[in-house]
Amino acid sequence: MNRLPSSASALACSAHALNLIEKRTLDHEEMKALNREVIEYFKEHVNPGFLEYRKSVTAGGDYGAVEWQAGGLNTLVDTQGQEFIDCLGGFGIFNVGHRNPVVVSAVQNQLAKQPLHSQELLDPLRAMLAKTLAALTPGKLKYSFFCNSGTESVEAALKLAKAYQSPRGKFTFIATSGAFHGKSLGALSATAKSTFRKPFMPLLPGFRHVPFGNIEAMRTALNECKKTGDDVAAVILEPIQGEGGVILPPPGYLTAVRKLCDEFGALMILDEVQTGMGRTGKMFACEHENVQPDILCLAKALGGGVMPIGATIATEEVFSVLFDNPFLHTTTFGGNPLACAAALATINVLLEQNLPAQAEQKGDMLLDGFRQLAREYPDLVQEARGKGMLMAIEFVDNEIGYNFASEMFRQRVLVAGTLNNAKTIRIEPPLTLTIEQCELVIKAARKALAAMRVSVEEA
């Protein structure tokens, strides 16, 4: 039976939500009621699949905690008052921590002036952020297009590459196996997970995938495309594959790909949506090899965990195809004042506190601890790997990975799997994680593995 619209119901629901937003704390009955409401509304109005996923990785097989607020800079608090060390980082958005006061203050100050731009007059913060990114990014990257997410950033990069290379008769894109570049139609064509691709086939034509980290496979693909007249417009890569399971390529791989792109006249697009903004121990992961892309994609941590923002930064030569008609690719909310304020504050915090260097130091500490655990539990752990504060623990099978996430949840440490590699649990905490919290995370992982071994032996 069709349901009639109800203004009264919508008004009551929105008023109830606003009342909750105003409250700093909830009493016990309010917490219980909120839990019930959230689970019901996810089931009936968001997507029940999310509930089943949360049930599979949380303690006791329930639906898990209902997130209510940030705790400290590196923790989350649920409606029951339980505090979790955040080792997921919202899949890489909380590089400067939760509710970083510098970022929050910048957004609040801008909100008091002008939350959104007119679209017709020039907006100062977009100009200032573009100038800042031109100074911050490597090589000849100069012009920025702003959007709201990593997927949008990749879409813009693909369209920009097409606009630049189409007059040259180059239409093919090369991506890599295990890649994740987003789920909109263009970005999904570069993504390499059949689960996400098959329901939407056919995707955009002209995309090929080669094994990640295999430079000879890349050369062969470029050669074959040239021989068949399918000349390559661009190669798109993640410096480290995040959703693929935190897969690091062999040393020198990015440098070699850059040389191949130059040799074949292909653009190099680096997707640093997850690896950028200090995550791997450098401001951008490509800086570990001093590689300079033609187009760079950013998002996630660029907004400081406070505002959504993405950016596509390109050289003047490439970006100039948009000069004659800047409306060829635009978005209403891209580069809005609140998002730009958050991004400018985030960059300031990263540089002022030297967080990329901290990511390298604390990442080494955590990775050493995880590798020691891998040696102690070879029956459970296949490998620990990573760079900076982007790490992964790969288990011997999918079930053990899920059990580890559940046990860590019991230890009040939040972790999660990767979308393209179910055996792998990602460790991606804020770069602001303290040394003491790093030690607590390693202890929690040891307790989790010990409990899992007991369960296996008892079974």
Curated annotation (Swiss-Prot):
PROSITE patterns: AA_TRANSFER_CLASS_3. The keyword Transferase applies. The modification N6-(pyridoxal phosphate)lysine is found at residue 300. GO terms for molecular function: diamine transaminase activity; identical protein binding; putrescine--2-oxoglutarate transaminase activity; pyridoxal phosphate binding. Its cofactor is pyridoxal 5'-phosphate. It catalyses: an alkane-alpha,omega-diamine + 2-oxoglutarate = an omega-aminoaldehyde + L-glutamate; putrescine + 2-oxoglutarate = 1-pyrroline + L-glutamate + H2O; cadaverine + 2-oxoglutarate = 5-aminopentanal + L-glutamate. It holds the Pfam family Aminotran_3. Keywords: Aminotransferase, Pyridoxal phosphate, Transferase. Pathway: Amine and polyamine degradation; putrescine degradation; 4-aminobutanal from putrescine (transaminase route): step 1/1. Belongs to the class-III pyridoxal-phosphate-dependent aminotransferase family. Putrescine aminotransferase subfamily. Catalyzes the aminotransferase reaction from putrescine to 2-oxoglutarate, leading to glutamate and 4-aminobutanal, which spontaneously cyclizes to form 1-pyrroline. This is the first step in one of two pathways for putrescine degradation, where putrescine is converted into 4-aminobutanoate (gamma-aminobutyrate or GABA) via 4-aminobutanal. Also functions as a cadaverine transaminase in a a L-lysine degradation pathway to succinate that proceeds via cadaverine, glutarate and L-2-hydroxyglutarate. This is Putrescine aminotransferase.
